[in-house]
């Protein structure tokens, strides 16, 4: 199982991204689900449509319809955790998309600290709730 950030998804879906083939190969080999925050999904959809066009967006929507990707639910408990993260790491200006992605990877809900992202700045600075560090893909392969 991998929690996905916008930058990693863009590499996977945008044919113009140089990292795309390696990311797609890694994701195709992944046995577990890909989990996406609804905030990441909204951010990603906008960027994908404006950068790669309608065909790329249709691929995303068809993947979502066939359960290739799982869209996580944002709960009131997540909102409280996000507020604490944003406050604790105020200097990073995390935003809700990154904060919720970190919560999904740090909570027991999905049992993973693996995140598909190229955002080293935010995801290296923040520590999972259970301690340790996030495993950032593809950097930590």
Label the predicted regions:
Residues 1-36, 49-62, 129-130, 141:
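Short, well-structured N-terminal submotif of metal-dependent ribonuclease cores
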Residues 8-9, 43-44, 81:
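A general alpha-helix detector
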Residues 29-31, 67, 92:
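Structured helix-beta-strand junction loops
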Residues 71-118:
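Active-site neighborhoods of divalent-metal-dependent phosphate/nucleic-acid chemistry enzymes
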Residues 102, 108-141:
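Acidic, PIN/NYN-like endoribonuclease modules and their adjacent C-terminal/linker elements
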């Amino acid at each position: 199982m991998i929690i996905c950030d916008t930058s990693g998804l863009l590499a996977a879906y945008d044919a113009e991204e140089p990292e795309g083939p390696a990311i797609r190969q890694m994701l195709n080999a992944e046995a577990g689900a890909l989990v996406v925050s609804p905030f990441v999904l909204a951010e990603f959809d906008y960027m994908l449509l404006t950068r790669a066009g309608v065909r790329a967006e249709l691929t995303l929507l068809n993947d979502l319809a066939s359960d290739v990707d799982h869209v996580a639910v944002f709960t009131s408990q997540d909102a409280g955790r996000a507020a604490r993260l944003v406050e604790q790491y105020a200097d990073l200006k995390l935003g809700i998309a990154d904060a919720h992605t970190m919560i999904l990877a740090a909570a027991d809900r999905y049992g993973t600290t693996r995140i598909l992202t190229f955002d080293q700045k935010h995801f290296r600075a923040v520590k999972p709730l259970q301690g340790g560090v996030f495993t950032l893909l593809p950097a930590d392969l």
